[in-house]
Amino acid sequence: MVIQWFPGHMAKARRQVTEKLKLIDVVIELVDARLPLSSRNPMIDEIITHKPRLVVLNKADMADDRLTKQWIAYFKEKGHMAISINAQAGQGMKEIAAACKVLVKEKFDKMVAKGIRPRAIRALIVGIPNVGKSTLINKLAKKNIAKTGDRPGVTTAQQWIKVGKEMELLDTPGILWPKFEDQLVGLRLATTGAIKDSILNLQDVAVYALRFMEKHYPERLKERYNLNEIPEDIVELFDAIGKNRGCLMGGGMIDYDKTSELVLRELRGGKLGKMTFETPEEFGEQVEDVEKIEEV
């Protein structure tokens, strides 16, 4: 399954982000804690270059806590300050502000030394669609400023938002890359809802999600769908889930589309518990002594 989705406003956003960088003190890169690397646009590294960066793992309430700690350690080893948050619940907002102050301290100290009065920190928020940028901005600003939704592509225009007297945020539309050459990355993004369902084959996505859970979270899969054992044959697994949850067509036939929608809706809604779809080890990174590494 090759996924292509690159609306015109995303291409425009890349140009605008590049233009705005000279105004920015720090970049807040928002990723999905359930897939911290797959939810990063590789173009971001090219665009941001040498700006101080804070990597924020959002939706930590839906991710595997043990793996979230490993990912924070991973980003720190790469030289990026990193924290985990739950923007929906407003958790981690103070940590973001504190981390940004640390990242711009050297620059602002130089400004003061030159007799320049410190101004508000100017931060750029970047990320792919549906990682929670608008929700984060609204929580930081304590106002319903940015449009929010669980559909990718909700934020379509750039805007400056004041966060108290100490910070100004520039929101940007989510920037996806033109084509997912890595099929696994595309499937992971599709599973968490970062890509519009309307352009996907949901059965393919559901097959990936079920096989992933079978391998990594089998007990949750069995408990949620009342399975004594998980059938090896994927069609039999769909049949068992569809029958258990009443996803039927006329004559008692299993409705595979409805079953696929059910599985993905429940997974995205947290009904199957906290889970993370990738680990640093998969990318050749060994993260040691994670428990000793404290978050910022």
UniProtKB/Swiss-Prot annotation:
GTP binds at N58, K59, A60, D61, N130, V131, G132, K133, S134, T135, G174. Keywords: Cytoplasm, GTP-binding, Hydrolase, Nucleotide-binding, Ribosome biogenesis, RNA-binding. Residues 14-178 form the CP-type G domain. GO terms for molecular function: GTP binding; GTPase activity; RNA binding. It is found in: Cytoplasm. SUPFAM superfamilies: P-loop containing nucleoside triphosphate hydrolases. GO terms for cellular component: cytoplasm. InterPro entries: G_CP_dom, GTP-bd, GTP-bd_ortho_bundle_sf, GTP-bd_ribosome_bgen, GTPase_MTG1, P-loop_NTPase. Essential protein that is required for a late step of 50S ribosomal subunit assembly. Has GTPase activity that is stimulated by interaction with the immature 50S ribosome subunit. Binds to the 23S rRNA. Required for the association of ribosomal proteins rplP and rpmA with the large subunit. Interacts with ctc. Interacts with the immature 50S ribosome subunit. 2 molecules of rbgA bind to one 50S subunit. This is Ribosome biogenesis GTPase A. The lineage of its organism: Bacteria, Bacillati, Bacillota, Bacilli, Bacillales. The gene is rbgA.
